[in-house]
């Protein structure tokens, strides 16, 4: 009986497995039934005690009963029947799955998760899984499960139990199936084979996913962008790109990741743990993918030993095999993977099977064709979430994202420098290692980059792939072809000399290619000079040389350049000059492939390769490449300066130096840039300038790879790395190499033995050596200051004599040095020759560009030794160090005040002298600082010039239609009216609200209002601020610092504006009290009696009868927003008058806030309750009502307040301070509002009028209460009887009566007993009292009210 049961069980297992395999073979995504999982791991299916299954335990101590076991088996059988119904399978088989079909052909969608199916029966079967009851609930996380086995597996995630252990590596697993899959990594078993490509897998799920690559099935679709995925996990990861969710956070550096695997890889960067070890060579890896790639080196090499015929090389050495098992027989390049090797071989066969249908361009790989095709379609599927920039390749997006994150993942192990790309790191590391991996097979020369090797090899092969279409001349580099083609622009030049030199001189071994040239040279040795000049008796060997010499006396220059009109005495000089315009260099060096414009320059250059120095100094035996260099050098020994200037008497060693000097007097600039038409006095300056257009930077720093246009900039930069005295070996090695490549030959440099610095000339070296010996031989007789060089002394003496020999022809301003004049003239011409390559910003001086470039590179080379703070400029470091030393070297002689900076002293002295040297050319207004003038100039529009207007009074200009509160502008006789359309340039616009600003910095601060960004955080209370200045002010609340002190009462203030407001109390200049003045004094600009062309401040008294004309004082609101208002005297007099109530204000901001009281404008709205406010500060305070925030605590009693002003008033209760005094009766008050209310008892003023009955009130709150008598509003309700009241006090009295049981008066009866009366004061606080009808004495009313209130 037992044997048939066993056979029946085996048959059941076989049928179930076959049915499940059938479904999988169709490519249908089906959830694996639990019974199939049990069969795969070898569990018993018919055990009556489920707890006896291996790996399962009893849950909460319960043992399943036999009835439960039977019900469970029935339930499972029903599930299997539903899932594996043969009729359904037949329906599935009836719909053939086409190869390459995708999810778009699956029209049946699951309503729960959106999963796609090819037939309706599959959807029905799938949806039954959602309808199953989840009866197993996890007590830890409330998760539910349909099957008990899934519930038991889930519980192990909470308990950490891993009952299945691998006997090979001791690794543990929660499920037996996971252990079986893992063991296949040791055995190498891959039992699941793809029928299409025969690829094998160790897990069935991997085969299922792989099958979808053949069928094109992508069952998981994104509901946002409709993109489909093969796996559900890929869809989950993709959805995070839409939501921005990064749920995995690193506990060490708080960095977040979208995937857990990325977090695991990242965590290993914090530790040295390498958990993945190679079993063959014991090498360890941080990531499993690295180990997998490494393992292929071992497994693929075993295969490559049998593929010698394919590889085409001899057996590889063990060293090469360990790294790259596949070697190319043509170029000897090695590869780690077979596929990469096959792709590479196609580059030699030039087979490009993938053709573009648009341009017929061929590609080796299909992926390259896909990327190329996007250049035609414009598709950029990879978009940056920060700036929405699109990219064709994902790798480009990854590199781009690093510009936003600042991430530089590739770090140099030598200098800790970081790079965004691995290739940049590889190139950089070669500067440390000196590695030159690209070696020439012909001459053994090595190069750091492959591109340089390719160019070099063309010297050996003779390959010149770039051909001129006009003259068939060929070139090694494309850049040489481009330069050559400029020759054909206008003038045809002669062919270059050949390299053949058959004629050799027996005296000096010089060779010549032409016989005539050789004969001319021979006469130099014979000394024969039969052609003599009649003027100076100088002799020449040839008549042509005499003709040329005579032109020196006559000044004749018959050869003229057609482009720049420059003339020359010889035709050869014209030809040489013409090459400056064409850029042609017809004389190439075959050693280094450098080209030259002249043959003589090539001969001199060639000596740098051979080391030949034929011209030696008889004094110091120093050798020189050129004879002219020896002649110049000899004058350093003799002190001879044979070339004097006829205008200033200055002498020079070289004639070229004299020519350059004379251009200072004549103003000649013969060197012309063809790009920007700029002219220069020296050819070297033009060469340097051209590099700003071409971007060439030939001088490279050997330490940081930074490049420079000039060698002097490199020398200055090297000080950053090596300090003030850089070693010669590291600092100037690169300079010497570049110097060999200069277009002109130069004598050997003079190195300093102290610091290794190199100089071109010996006098420069001698001057430099004095800096080490601290020898200053040139003292000043005026101030005893000494200098190293006499030129420095001459410049310094001009500061005493006041001599400024260099004058500007535009403004006649004088300067001590010519360089200062050159810089100044650029302010007139607008020339900015130094352009930033990053943002195209232009600068007048090179030093300004250098400083600006550091804002892009982040370089701060000047570090403070005390606090390690770094600065971009050395001057900033000097100023900063004064903070530590407390030094204030700049002293005011008038008030003995000291300053850390000279500019601060200059600005301060203008307070004493009242000098305002910066006048506005439009309106004549003057300013003490240039920055204020620049801000003011933006108020004037260039499109609408000012038009002078006048009235009968001579100073009032009226506007026609302006709804703004102020309608007039008051100026002097020569004042100009600026229309609202000319309201200043505001070129920076906010994209959110359309508001415009004159300065970019103001726009940046404004944008933070929309974004909510508050980058400045307080370290004491974690409060944040939009501006740094606000943080500084706030920090004083913690430190107690009050830097602004009143000179009259010794009171201190946190802000300067608070001090200004306080000082008005002493001067009796309250803007509120000034509104009652019968006449006002206004200062305006008028003509001076002494000089009609100048504007001076004039005082005008505005009388009572003139007030109708000027009650709407000074200027339209639109102009106020872009204008500096007219100067008002005396200081503190109100400048802004309200046209509605006549009230005057000193500050425009206070006036604008006041004006909103009349207009009712409330632009600031609360998002919580919709309430609006006229001021942003009121909104901020209101929001704290919702949040409950009270950031201002009292240090005495601990009570907190929403506003700082409330805290200040509260603290006066503890101190007893009453700083506000009534000027009439001398009574004192705690706050200013109390004294204002009190002052109305003297004046009888009632500013708050009721629109219904014209009744007046002293306080606005009384008006609000009164208005409820008209509207009937009763906002205060009783909690006991639902009765409502119009005032809070009435509600409080009523609730007391409800609580105590005492009767209460009817509110209408109470209101009928009262009428509004004068203000009566009790104690220190003003209270508005309502007097009962018939009671004349207010004090009796006070007693009556007190009695009722009790």
UniProtKB/Swiss-Prot annotation:
* Tissue-by-tissue expression: Expressed in oocytes, and in specialized cell types such as neural retina cones in adults.
Q: Which UniProt keywords apply?
A: Cytoplasm, Metal-binding, Phosphoprotein, Repeat, RNA-binding, Zinc, Zinc-finger
Q: Where in the cell is it found?
A: Cytoplasm
Indicate whether Glycosyltransferase appears among the record's keywords. Answer: no
**Pfam families in UniProt:** zf-C2H2, zf-C2H2_6
**What GO molecular function terms would the record report?**
DNA-binding transcription factor activity, RNA polymerase II-specific; RNA binding; RNA polymerase II cis-regulatory region sequence-specific DNA binding; zinc ion binding
Q: Where is this region: Disordered?
A: 47-68
Residue span, KRAB domain: 1-58
Q: How is it modified after translation?
A: Phosphorylated. Phosphorylation enhances RNA binding.
Q: What is its main location?
A: cytoplasm
Q: Kindly list the GO CC terms recorded for this protein.
A: cytoplasm
Zinc fingers (C2H2-type): give the ranges: 108-130, 136-158, 164-186, 192-214, 220-242, 248-270, 276-298, 326-348, 354-376, 382-404, 410-432, 438-460, 466-488, 503-525, 531-553, 559-581, 587-609, 615-637, 643-665, 671-693, 699-721, 750-772, 778-800, 806-828, 834-856, 862-884, 890-912, 918-940, 988-1010, 1016-1038, 1044-1066, 1136-1158, 1164-1186, 1192-1214, 1220-1242, 1248-1270, 1276-1298
InterPro entries in alphabetical order: C2H2-ZF_domain (IPR050752), KRAB (IPR001909), KRAB_dom_sf (IPR036051), Znf_C2H2_sf (IPR036236), Znf_C2H2_type (IPR013087)
Q: Which Gene3D superfamilies match?
A: Classic Zinc Finger (3.30.160.60)
Protein family (similarity comment): Belongs to the krueppel C2H2-type zinc-finger protein family.
Instruction: Please explain the role this protein plays, according to its UniProt record.
Output: Binds to poly-G sequences in RNA. May function in post-translational regulation processes.
Output this protein's name.
Answer: Zinc finger protein Xfin
Q: Which organism is it from?
A: Xenopus laevis
